[in-house]
A protein has these predicted regions:
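Active-site loop/oxyanion-hole signature of alpha/beta-hydrolase fold enzymes
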Residues: 5-46, 203-204
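Residue in the alpha/beta-hydrolase core beta-strand immediately N-terminal to the catalytic nucleophile
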Residues: 44, 69-72, 150
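Flexible "cap/lid" loop of the alpha/beta hydrolase fold
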Residues: 53-61, 66-102
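Conserved alpha/beta-hydrolase catalytic His-Asp/Glu region
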Residues: 84, 99-153
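Short beta-strand/loop motif that positions the catalytic acidic residue
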Residues: 152, 158-160, 164
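Conserved alpha/beta-hydrolase "acid-adjacent" motif
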Residues: 165-171
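Catalytic histidine neighborhood in serine/cysteine hydrolases
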Residues: 176-193
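Catalytic histidine-centered segment of alpha/beta-hydrolase-like enzymes
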Residues: 190-203
């Protein structure tokens, strides 16, 4: 009998916030520890966005006490893009603003100004995150996993919305090229949250990939 476990990592959803900021290896260790504690010997892994990023790194772990048969990556993060000129300028402006507003006199006079500036520059996730999770997000988004993709040695299904702006379809094409035994399913006119926009179709594709069920 198959069992499905939905695992929410530290700092995500309603889970507890970590005491310190985490990096990709911390999340991988968290997953491995959980699987071992549950005494799971074989499993399939499904990850969306950062969940996919964690799976990519986990699949490159030297020694696992369990067997991963297949993986599904949905709009997976993990490929770092070169920053555009406008993005570089924004980062530069933010660093200058941060330096200026670190002066005590200005901090006392404008206590919330730096926070407002941060909110102008960050992504939606960054804006809504706590300070610890903001540090975590910075670590994660700057971790490029391209070099790990060719070492994934299990059948891999990639599911992507063609209109994904967070992890563009070009990322999916790159992963399909780099992961040896992989296939890409493009879902037309869907965003980063393709599994919410086309849940029945996505579920059917995953079931067929994992079990050969076409229902």
């Amino acid at each position: 009998m198959q069992q499905f476990i939905r695992l929410i990592c530290l700092g995500c959803g309603n889970s507890d916030e970590p005491k310190n900021s985490l990096d990709i290896d911390d999340y991988v260790s968290f997953i491995i520890k959980f699987v071992e504690q549950q005494n799971i010997k074989e499993l399939e892994l499904i990850g969306h966005s950062n969940g996919g990023r964690i799976i990519i790194k986990l699949m490159n772990s030297k020694k696992l006490n369990f067997k991963v048969n297949r993986i599904v990556l949905i709009g997976s993060a993990g490929i770092v893009h070169k920053k555009s000129l406008s993005k570089k300028l924004k980062i530069r402006m933010f660093k200058i603003s941060k330096k200026i507003l670190s002066i005590n006199i200005l901090q006392n006079k404008f206590p919330n100004l730096l926070l407002k500036i941060k909110n102008c520059f960050g992504s939606v996730d960054y804006k809504t995150a706590t300070p610890i999770m903001r540090e975590t997000l910075v670590k994660l988004v700057n971790t490029d996993l391209k070099e790990y993709l060719p070492h994934i040695n299990v059948p891999t299904l990639l599911i992507w919305g063609t209109d994904d702006k967070e992890t563009p379809i070009s990322d999916a094409l790159a992963m399909e090229k780099l992961i040896p035994d992989s296939g890409l399913v493009k879902v037309q006119n869907c965003s980063h949250y393709v599994f919410l926009e086309e849940p029945i179709y996505v579920n059917r594709v995953i079931r067929f990939f994992l079990n050969g069920e076409n229902k």
